[in-house]
Design a protein with these regions (language model features):
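Short beta-strand-turn/beta-hairpin segments enriched in glycine/proline and small hydrophobics
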Residues: 1-13, 30-46, 73
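Short histidine-centered loop motifs in beta-beta connectors
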Residues: 16-20, 53-56
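Short, well-structured beta-strand-loop connectors
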Residues: 20-31, 58-68
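Short alpha-helical linear motifs
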Residues: 52, 69-73
Length: 74
């Protein structure tokens, strides 16, 4: 099994985490909701698999390139 890292594209605040470790996600499923410059930005999975790590908490300020979620996929 391979791991896919979901990383932040910009500086933002983590508004909502919509998945938990162990959740099975499909490509296109929402993982997180971020806020940047008063805009809400959904973070969608690019792969199908199982969430194995959530590296952020709600309310955290993240930087571009920060690890958000790790997904194990076939």
């Amino acid at each position: 099994m391979a791991h896919f890292d979901v990383r932040a594209e910009m500086v933002a605040n983590v508004l909502t985490i919509t998945v938990r470790v162990g959740d099975v996600v499909a490509s296109g499923d929402q993982l997180l909701l971020l806020e940047s410059m008063k805009m809400e930005i959904p973070v969608l999975s690019e792969v199908s698999g199982t969430v194995v790590e959530i590296a952020v908490v709600e309310g955290e300020v993240i930087q571009g390139g920060d690890l958000l979620v790790k997904i194990e996929h076939p």
